[in-house]
Amino acid sequence: MFLTLSIWSCEKDKTLLIKDIPDWLKTQISGLEQEIKADPNTLTVYSAWVRFEWKNNYYFEYLDPPRSYRSLPRNLDGTNINIEDLNNYEKEKCCMQYVWKAPKH
């Protein structure tokens, strides 16, 4: 039982609180949840939204492994990262946290 609680505690620390999720992302997540509810067999059940830190800012990425898709990182206001910054972002980003995980992610 202790091991289970420890794992749960670690996972909890890696998931953001609802107050830390920007409104534009809450809307995206709501749409994904509706899609999954309408079709439980959709590949969306394997997806997730994650947050990284880079240069004292937060960036959000949508991961969809079955479709080999990953969105461009978006900042807190939902704007995509500048393409010119993408290589440095990929090398320097840190501190991944799950924002939302679909049921089978």
Question: How would you name each of these model-derived features?
Answer:
Residues S47-R70:
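Exposed beta-strand-loop-beta-strand "reactive/processing" segments of non-cytosolic proteins
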Residues E11-D13:
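Bacterial signal peptide processing site
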Residues S68-E84:
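A short, surface-exposed beta-strand/turn
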Residues T15-L43:
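Short, non-transmembrane alpha-helical segments in secretory-pathway proteins
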Residues T79-H105:
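C-terminal partner/receptor-binding element of secreted or periplasmic proteins
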Residues S6-S9:
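C-terminal motif of bacterial Sec signal peptides marking the signal peptidase cleavage site
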